[in-house]
């Protein structure tokens, strides 16, 4: 995260004293719970995609996480990474990475109780943000607030946006047309490569393919 937590003090001696086991997962739990207490929050969230790879370790600390699986058309994800300053750039590698991430998330879904796993489709979110956020709040047993839709006005969003071009959009309202950009900006060859690698996952998640089957 390019933006440090504000108004939160993390003392090493207090963190160590609060740990019930000597693991990185326990440090993770204690630090986030400390931050939540200091801000008066009843919930805390870590948005790292890598959490899905360490779910068993995280759960070994005694917490029972709610998992939010935000998924997007992988071809638009690939296009975004091709423009970013980080990450793979070749469409084959991007397709492989996206496929592995979705497979890992779906494996986690299979081993998680339905009331602790929320599938959130990106395209549905940007088309009907309030409806989807109300559904998410219901899932988390949290009251919905209209302030949710004002995220881009927060000081944290402003601080994040100036940290680099990758985060420029966090100071903008939801971009309702931010979908299917790959149709305009990826070549038909790149689309075919992506679909040959990850077409099965695209279909499983409800997306349609652009390339005729005999060309995959």
What do these predicted ranges mean?
Residues 1-46, 175:
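PAPS-dependent sulfation machinery
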Residues 13-16, 21-22, 82-85, 102, ...:
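PAPS-dependent sulfotransferases, especially Golgi type II membrane carbohydrate sulfotransferases
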Residues 45-47, 69, 119-121, 148-152:
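Short beta-strand segments
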Residues 47-50, 57-82, 194:
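Conserved phosphate-donor/acceptor-positioning beta-strand/loop module used by diverse small-molecule
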Residues 50-53, 73-77, 84, 124-127, ...:
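Short, solvent-exposed loop/turn segments at secondary-structure junctions
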Residues 57-62, 119-144, 170-173, 194:
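PAPS/PAP-binding and catalytic site of the sulfotransferase fold
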Residues 65, 115-117:
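Short, conserved active-site loop motifs that form the nucleotide-linked donor/cofactor pocket
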Residues 68, 76-100:
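A glycine- and Lys/Arg-enriched "phosphate-lid" helix/loop adjacent to the NTP-binding pocket
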